[in-house]
């Protein structure tokens, strides 16, 4: 911790996107929480209408690694287990980004929860959408 993030011995950094409207956002869903389908798709639509585009890669760890190296600008998922986000959280923070819950608070250690990972510049815009739905 405190030494930066690297890919193939080269330093990586989160993207420089300043606004959600210029951002590419990855989204996550879980096959274990079908009761969240209505909420998920309502939020996905709102984000889709506010950003450049959205993607669904299928792996929270990969989504978050892409945030860390600037390939995408943000990622969110309503419920993730700590083993799905803990390592990637450190990677993003070391690359200059920010990872919180949907209230903008620090993620609880060892507990499942909502995860928003971003470059730090667009997190507030996404939090407004995520918290009002």
Placement of each model-derived feature along the sequence:
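Acidic beta-strand-loop-alpha-helix segment within the catalytic core
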Residues: 1-62, 112-133
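Alpha-to-beta junction loops
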Residues: 69-74, 97-98
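Acidic donor-binding loop at a coil-to-helix junction in glycosyltransferase catalytic cores
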Residues: 83
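Acidic, metal-binding active-site segment of PIN/NYN-like and related structure-specific nucleases
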Residues: 96-111
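Short secondary-structure boundary segments
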Residues: 29, 78-80, 103-105
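Small-residue (primarily alanine) positions within well-ordered alpha-helices
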Residues: 5, 88, 95-97
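Hydrophobic residues within well-ordered alpha-helices
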Residues: 65-68, 89-94
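A short, glycine/Asx- and small/polar-enriched loop/turn
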Residues: 20, 68-71, 109-112
